[in-house]
């Protein structure tokens, strides 16, 4: 042991000097990239400010937003595990990022370490004509016919879960129940059934739910890709989820080859793919695309992720906002009652939802004032001139804030006012550039009509079937990142039957 120490000891000063040199280079690199922008003067070696981000993300992002608003530049900077990050408050600059998603500018990544977590077969990483073609092929998944099919499926699942919630609440009427996990489970059940319908059996669903929970937890943890760490568990879980969905793709493809009626999203998708392939064959053309089942499974996982967490967030905030605005709640109930009554025993149809204009305005206002996914991370593939006096360095992770944009432009943006989206005011059109919660540019949410319909359906049924009251405590409505935003108390409410159904 002494001999080993004797061999190493002469090198220790050089090793320490080398580490000190690396630390110095890191600080110089950060300062050079930061320039005149608001942000930390110096950063913690190697880790940067990842610990504050993980331990209190709400405080971290609130500070970045405040720094971005503190100057006329409209953006601020920080440093996370070797990555220089730039937070954008300005709506105009956010649009500049969204409009320049291409190989030599910005790459959408979905998460600061998204490519490692989500895998290669992912819609968000695509560019150009290939991306346009895929979105075109996805479009038939959201036609009125498809949305009508989904509404029937969603309604059955929603009622099942509402009954379960009410049964739980009736066991202890004076104790509030937290809805976040209940909403998550309901939306996961809904998403699975709408997207892959009969192709997931009971055992597959159980495994799917466990793996999706691994994924969700890993999104909020340090990106340590080692055995036993949440990030590694999440990465491996995504692989298993995609494999499961790939099997569903194959089963759906076989069903659609037999010209059976579509019963879920993947059926509509495979039906359209087969139509395009057959049309090319008739015209003597080559097969128009080459998607493997694995690739399609990856794209399906994108849909699931987008639908699941955003829908849960939106529903929780709907309950919070409707509880605190009883006059809006009454107008929602009146709007729903004009077209549907739970006592009628008739289903609430997609056509009925189309007629509920005030309900749609409420859904859009909820998404505006509490954008579920508050930021849309991109990475700069090359240097990019964002303003006249600042060039974003290559490799920078850029966070355009769609949440901040919702509070720019609109009159009294802090006020929950669904009337702003009614025909008389048309603020959705007047301030269209500020309404970014559903995205913008080539990667705008391809399923936004489905997302709005889903939220409208749940609100309509929840308000018609259930009486609810928030359990108010200090800070209960503060924002918590999980990774989409939710009320800090997990939305604790008292629930009771409103009708006999």
Curated annotation (Swiss-Prot):
GO BP terms in the entry = sterol biosynthetic process
Q: What does this protein do?
A: No activity with 24-epi-campesterol.
Pathway involvement? Steroid biosynthesis; sterol biosynthesis
Annotated TM spans: 4-24
Report if keyword Signal is assigned: no
Q: What protein family does this chain belong to?
A: Belongs to the cytochrome P450 family.
Q: Which Gene3D superfamilies does this chain map to? A: Cytochrome P450
* UniProt keyword list: Heme, Iron, Membrane, Metal-binding, Monooxygenase, NADP, Oxidoreductase, Transmembrane, Transmembrane helix
Against CDD domains, the record matches this protein to: CYP61_CYP710 (cd11082)
Q: Which reaction does it catalyse?
A: 5-dehydroepisterol + NADPH + O2 + H(+) = ergosta-5,7,22,24(28)-tetraen-3beta-ol + NADP(+) + 2 H2O
Q: How does it sit in the membrane?
A: Single-pass membrane protein
Q: Which GO terms describe its cellular component?
A: membrane
User: Which EC numbers does the record give?
Assistant: 1.14.19.41
The UniProt GO MF terms for this protein read: C-22 sterol desaturase (NADPH) activity; heme binding; iron ion binding; monooxygenase activity; oxidoreductase activity
* Cofactor(s) the record lists: heme
> Major location, coarse class?
membrane
Record's keyword annotation contains Plastid: no
Subcellular location field: Membrane
Q: Which residues bind heme?
A: 445
Protein name as catalogued: Cytochrome P450 710A11
Q: Which InterPro entries has this protein been placed in? A: Cyt_P450, Cyt_P450_E_grp-IV, Cyt_P450_sf
Species of the source: Solanum lycopersicum
Q: Name one Pfam family in it.
A: p450
